[in-house]
């Protein structure tokens, strides 16, 4: 773990590992992990945002939207898998969780208060910082379909994890997603954070090793 690898070489190495391992799971997820030099206990050093991956995620994201009035239909028209108001809140409260992302309009936030216990631990609570609390539900749905992923630094360890595509992607597609994600994380450096912000960057696969990336090679061509 102490040797630094060129980003493109790391992608190729992991793709070759999957091929050579004879794993039945041939289309594995590539994941980016970034260790941040922040104090997660400090309110002014929280890192949470989102990024639209230029090559997409390679998987279908199931989107649920909590909205009122005509915005419920707008969400459905944009392609949301589920949309509703009180009845959808009740369904989630009763334990239904057949979605990957939850989007809510600002006027429904009082309804969502009762879902904190259910959604919080799963990291599914809508938040304005990552664009999941918005009045423009149609845009939020379209962005998510286009490959938008949200991320946040974990409270313990200050590590950001996010998927950057599938092993079926080309090296260029994975590299473009990797660079976009790293740039977005860099952009979200809290002003109160001192010292080295991005301490280490790793790329790993679902069933295999993680490789430490030389950050100087994370430059878009």
Ranges and model annotations:
Residues 80-188:
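Long, charge-patterned amphipathic alpha-helical coiled-coil/hairpin "stalk" segments used as oligomerization
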Residues 213-221:
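Short, charged, intrinsically disordered terminal tails
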């Amino acid at each position: 773990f102490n040797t630094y690898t060129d980003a493109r070489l790391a992608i190729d190495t992991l793709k070759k590992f999957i091929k050579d391992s004879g794993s039945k799971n041939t289309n594995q997820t590539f994941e980016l992990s970034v260790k941040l030099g922040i104090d997660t206990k400090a309110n002014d050093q929280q890192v949470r945002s989102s990024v639209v991956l230029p090559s997409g995620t390679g998987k279908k994201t199931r989107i649920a939207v909590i909205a009122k009035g005509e915005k419920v239909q707008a969400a459905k028209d944009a392609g949301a898998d589920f949309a509703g108001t009180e009845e959808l809140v009740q369904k989630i409260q009763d334990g239904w969780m057949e979605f990957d992302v939850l989007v809510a309009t600002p006027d429904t936030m009082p309804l969502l208060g009762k879902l904190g216990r259910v959604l919080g631990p799963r990291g599914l609570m809508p938040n304005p910082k990552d664009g999941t609390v918005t009045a423009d539900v149609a845009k939020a749905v379209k962005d998510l379909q286009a490959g938008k992923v949200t991320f946040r630094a974990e409270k313990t360890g200050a590590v950001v994890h996010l998927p950057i595509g599938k092993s079926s992607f080309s090296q260029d597609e994975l590299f473009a997603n990797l660079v976009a994600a790293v740039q977005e994380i860099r952009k979200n450096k809290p002003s109160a954070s001192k010292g080295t912000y991005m301490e280490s960057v790793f790329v790993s696969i679902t069933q295999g090793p993680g490789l430490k990336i030389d950050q100087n090679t994370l430059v878009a061509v």
